[in-house]
């Protein structure tokens, strides 16, 4: 409150919206290969250097954008601020307009220190683990989805060079009936560049995420439109 925030929510809510749209795309039978659209760095890489692969990139909002859209539909006039470990989200926020400001954890920490804000201990009761909380780890998008009996193969790729190799393989037409989760950061979002000294070793961080997630689903109101026109 001291910094001007009225509420705080998990963007795992937005992740739940996005993974639901991915499930619908697969169930529709209209897509042969689908690339996840959550990582803006991957999206930008495809848009700039591999435009022939754009038809395979899911035309679905990222969790950040989907969550911000829901917040604004439910709270007209609200200013939506995303906070995370990703620098690329700043450009994404500027491009699409759903998110008013994208901050990194490092920027938030500096702001709190400047304002003399000391975080209080977590007083909330733990809830049932939610699938959407898997998103920030490698394979987490897939882990959040219902993948049984779809006829699709689910693959997770992380690291820029691995993503480029996967994109070239898709471009060659070698893959069929595949959903491919792509993250530019090795280890996915929990290994993002702007976490500062709070950064945990990769495996320890993944263990924490898995312990916080689970099989339950967030009960979310789907936004009026979850699709975006890729610029």
Residue ranges and their predicted role:
Residues 1-231:
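Iron-sulfur-associated redox domains of electron-transfer enzymes in respiratory
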């Amino acid at each position: 409150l001291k910094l001007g925030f009225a509420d705080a929510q998990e963007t795992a809510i937005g992740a739940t919206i996005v993974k639901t749209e991915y499930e619908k795309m697969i169930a529709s039978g209209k897509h042969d290969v689908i690339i996840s659209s959550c990582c803006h760095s991957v999206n930008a890489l495809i848009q700039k250097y591999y435009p022939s692969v754009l038809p395979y990139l899911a035309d679905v909002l990222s969790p950040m954008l989907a969550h911000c859209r829901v917040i604004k539909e439910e709270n007209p006039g609200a200013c939506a601020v995303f906070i995370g470990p990703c620098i690329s989200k700043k450009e994404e926020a500027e491009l699409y307009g759903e998110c008013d400001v994208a901050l990194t954890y490092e920027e938030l920490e500096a702001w709190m220190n400047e304002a003399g804000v000391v975080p209080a201990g977590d007083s909330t009761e733990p809830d049932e683990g939610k699938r959407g909380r898997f998103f920030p780890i490698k394979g987490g998008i897939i882990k959040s989805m219902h993948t049984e009996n779809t006829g699709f193969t689910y693959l997770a790729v992380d690291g820029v060079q691995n993503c480029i190799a996967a994109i070239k393989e898709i471009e060659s037409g070698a893959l069929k009936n595949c959903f491919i989760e792509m993250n530019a950061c090795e280890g996915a979002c929990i290994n993002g560049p702007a976490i500062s000294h709070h950064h945990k070793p990769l495996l320890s961080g993944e263990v924490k995420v898995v312990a916080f997630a689970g099989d339950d689903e967030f009960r979310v109101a789907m936004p009026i439109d979850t699709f975006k026109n890729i610029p």
